[in-house]
């Protein structure tokens, strides 16, 4: 990823701009590194907020995100999501052993807030919103309330200690389910917003995914697909 689109590429953002829409992209961008011709603001998007770094997009607690072309630093510590196995000697069954992988600012919360702000700012004119959420891509990190919801449903389970890449996780099945449910919750909030602003009946929503079954990062697709 990150190989930049060429300056003259016809993107869906450009097409919508030409049709008179204000355009926004929120989430993960991998079509042009910062400073290149492939950044969202140079490829048809009036507004961008999210990840423009493939490595940091594999943790939900990144040290920075991008607000249009500007890097915005967060309070999270730098973590390499591909080289952070469980500490040597740590108890894999103790939730405290995984505490350092949960930091202060959860990127998806920040991205969703900006997305909803975009809807507010453009609700009285045509807008095109592309929401490229990283959920439920690994690493396995989700709001604790949703994780505990599924821990109660699934019971105890084998920890994921990082042996197949990405960050360790005490409750991998519960956390993967939590990520999906959290995304579903946010979709519901967006739809309710559209309804409250009397936009829903005049809005086309297209849901698609580029993430097929994955075997790494503790996601355990065979277990998920067995349900």
What do the predicted segments below correspond to?
Residues 1-227:
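Formylglycine-dependent sulfatase
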């Amino acid at each position: 990823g990150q190989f930049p689109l060429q300056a003259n590429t016809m993107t869906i953002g450009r097409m919508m701009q030409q049709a008179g829409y204000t355009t926004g992209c929120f989430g993960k961008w991998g079509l042009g590194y910062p400073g290149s011709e492939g950044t969202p603001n140079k490829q048809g998007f009036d507004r961008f907020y999210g990840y423009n770094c493939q490595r940091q997009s594999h943790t939900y607690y990144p040290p920075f995100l991008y607000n249009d072309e500007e890097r915005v630093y967060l309070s999270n510590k730098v973590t390499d999501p591909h080289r952070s196995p469980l500490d040597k000697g740590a108890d894999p069954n103790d939730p405290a052993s995984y505490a350092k992988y949960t930091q202060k600012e959860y990127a998806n919360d920040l991205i969703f807030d900006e997305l909803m702000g975009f809807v507010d700012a453009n609700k009285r004119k045509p807008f095109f919103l592309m929401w490229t959420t990283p959920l439920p891509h690994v690493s396995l990190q989700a709001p604790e309330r949703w994780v505990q919801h599924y821990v109660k449903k699934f019971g105890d389970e084998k920890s994921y200690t990082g042996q197949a890449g990405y960050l360790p996780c005490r409750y991998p099945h519960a956390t993967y389910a939590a990520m999906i449910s959290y995304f579903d919750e946010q979709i519901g909030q967006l739809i309710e917003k559209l309804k409250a602003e009397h936009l829903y009946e005049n809005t086309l929503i297209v849901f698609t995914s580029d993430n097929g079954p994955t075997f790494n990062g503790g996601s355990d697709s065979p277990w998920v697909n067995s349900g």
